[in-house]
């Protein structure tokens, strides 16, 4: 990641990257801390004057000085691997100046268009977040939505379709605050996001509030490297559909992708492999359907025989026919129910995969 705004280099096997992709810029994003002084409330860090200094090639320090050289507020940024930026807000010698209660980190952003269509990007964009002791959750991707953060939160992510901007706390942000998301789809923006995060703390002689920012692609391996379930930003569905996509479809996809094949060919091969996996179920379904077709004339005859007669007798004779021929009328339904999670997992997996983005195949310019 380059140390300029939010530029992200995304390598591709098939397509050259002509220019860095920009998730947001100075006009579309605003982040600041609400800080309360013991003698005054409502100070915003973006109203303070910070003096920058570069300690190392990958480290930036911003310092807001006071009239006392031993008292200052400092922000430290350090570029790390996997699109991460380590950050800390430090209060030095401010224990008699700063009130650590009701301190919040505010982040507001309008998502720049990164895809060809604002409508399509907005449908796959929202605010995702993970309560410390629960699974990830998210706001509506289709309409304006908001939620209160009622428990500790591990991370909050502004998802821009195939990319995300996130803030992470190893210990978990304290309960309190809220998140907001709304599609706007106007001009160069697709969505608007807001997060108000509780970072209240006790202020002593040297207090540090650490967190990590992530600005990068929604790549499963990259997100999973955080070891905090951030990979769940990639929406593969829910329940058994998600489980099937994660533990069946994705391993097959990763195996084939390791051979550097064209992405369109990989889609074809994954589809064929899945069809082979469910072939026994498909065969059983076809076999049951064939038997029912053979019996159709006899079933029709029974229906005509009891057209105005006893329904119980009709049912009894129909079941006797099934037993005599060894046909189970429900045998064709069970294979279909078993196949559904696999087929729907395939259907959900490909549109959610960043590997599809900007990959062409035959007449398709973009497989995503």
Description of each model-found segment:
Residues 1-232:
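Soluble non-transmembrane domains of integral membrane proteins
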Residues 88-90, 101, 111-121, 155, ...:
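Helix-loop-helix
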């Amino acid at each position: 990641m380059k140390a300029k705004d939010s530029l992200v280099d995304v390598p591709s096997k098939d397509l050259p990257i002509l220019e860095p992709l920009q998730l947001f810029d100075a006009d579309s994003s605003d982040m600041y801390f609400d800080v309360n002084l013991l003698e005054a409330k409502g100070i915003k860090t973006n109203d303070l004057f910070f003096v920058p200094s570069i300690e190392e090639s990958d480290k930036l320090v911003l310092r807001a000085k006071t009239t006392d050289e031993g008292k200052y507020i400092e922000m430290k940024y350090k570029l790390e691997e996997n699109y991460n930026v380590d950050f800390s807000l430090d209060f030095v010698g401010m224990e008699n100046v700063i009130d650590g209660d009701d301190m919040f980190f505010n982040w507001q952003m309008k998502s720049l268009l990164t895809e060809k269509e604002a409508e399509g990007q907005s449908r796959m964009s929202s605010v995702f977040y993970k309560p410390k002791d629960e699974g990830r959750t998210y706001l509506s991707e289709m309409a304006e939505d908001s939620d209160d953060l009622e428990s500790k939160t591990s991370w909050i992510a502004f998802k821009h379709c195939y990319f995300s901007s996130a803030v992470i706390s190893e210990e978990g942000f304290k309960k309190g605050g809220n998140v907001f998301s709304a599609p706007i789809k106007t001009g160069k923006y697709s969505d608007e996001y807001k997060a108000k995060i509780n970072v209240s703390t006790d202020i002593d002689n040297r207090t540090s509030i650490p967190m990590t920012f992530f600005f990068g692609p929604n790549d499963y391996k990259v997100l999973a490297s955080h070891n905090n379930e951030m990979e769940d930003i990639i929406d593969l569905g829910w329940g058994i559909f998600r489980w099937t996509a994660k533990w069946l479809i994705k391993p097959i996809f990763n195996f084939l992708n390791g051979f550097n094949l064209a992405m369109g060919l990989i889609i074809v091969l994954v589809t064929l492999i899945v069809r082979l996996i469910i072939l026994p179920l498909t065969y059983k379904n076809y076999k049951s359907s064939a038997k029912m077709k053979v019996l159709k004339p006899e079933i029709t005859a029974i229906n005509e025989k009891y057209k105005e007669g006893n329904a119980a007798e009709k049912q009894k004779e129909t079941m006797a026919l099934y037993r005599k021929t060894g046909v189970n009328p429900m045998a064709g339904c069970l294979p279909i129910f078993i196949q559904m999670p696999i087929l729907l997992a395939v259907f959900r997996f490909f549109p959610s995969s960043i590997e599809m983005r900007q990959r062409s195949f035959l007449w398709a310019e973009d497989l995503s």
